[in-house]
Amino acid sequence: EISACLVGSEMCIRDRGMTAAEASCRSGGTIIMCAECADGHGGEGFYKALRDCKSPAELYARQMATPQDKTAPDQWESQILARILMHHKVIVVSRPEMQKTIEDMKMQYAPNLDAALKAARYGSSKTLTVIPNGISVIIVNQ
């Protein structure tokens, strides 16, 4: 199962859109994000939390164990992405300058949608959900 979202001028805004894809994609499925990231990765703490963690699961467990009054600024952003990465492969289609940042943040880079679909092994037996403007979508499971 593959879900795709198109949102955001920076990586941290894409977390918000990715939650729509997360809700529509079964565990083990692939989420493809398409965005230029013209403003880079967003907050430095967001980037470093993912870059420096051993794994998304380790980061998520550590953040969940952090008392509410001790959370890092904007911790929620990296916490959401870590949660998503624990259950989904995430491929980010963006400009070439973002490849290292994307890979540092435990995601896979693709230069275009065709390459992302190939990396996701999308075939006739898979389903594809496209969520335009994912940041403003509410998924209702029925």
What are these regions (language model features)?
Residues 1-8, 12-13:
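Single conserved hydrophobic/aromatic residue that forms the stacking wall/gate
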